[in-house]
Amino acid sequence: MCAQCGGPVAAELDLFGALGMPRRLVIEPAELEQRYHDLGRRIHPDRFASGAPAVKEASLKGTALLTRAYRVLRDPVSRGLYWLELNGEKLSDDNKQVPPELAALVFEVQEQLAELREASEPTASESLAAAIREWRGTVQEAMDRARDALAMNFAKWDEGRAEPNSLIAELKKTLSEIAYLRTLLRDIDRELEPPSLSG
């Protein structure tokens, strides 16, 4: 926003700057939401409907940037991926393989899901579904631990407690684990979902 006229500014900003926030990974959700809504009201295209075309265009671009910034920064995983991007990094193919710490869990759950898909007897299906519900709890616990590790990594970045290269490696590892656990939870939930009655 222009400090003089209150109009939108079309300058290229990073997503933190778009919301007027410092580049920090630990973000208070209420503050993020408040900034998003306050800035959104100030640069909303309706406020500039009678303005010059360049001002209208800047308002539209500013609103789009603001919305993208909010969506990315409110989700810790998206924020972590964006942080990697800001640091010239991304998850490589190595980080997209099953993390060794999760290999046994992923294998066991996928095996149980395959058995459930192939089960033809209702009692076998019910028994397998019960076992998979238990596995879901185990996967959710692993997800909670990974999210805690992500929060700790964010705090280390913000406090400058470790060397950036080691923090990037740790961040990549944690984001990779979360990606696998999200996929596993999605697969479990999909298989446990009751069949649709619409036909």
Q: What is the role of each PLM region?
A:
Residues M1-G199:
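C-terminal accessory/regulatory regions appended to core domains
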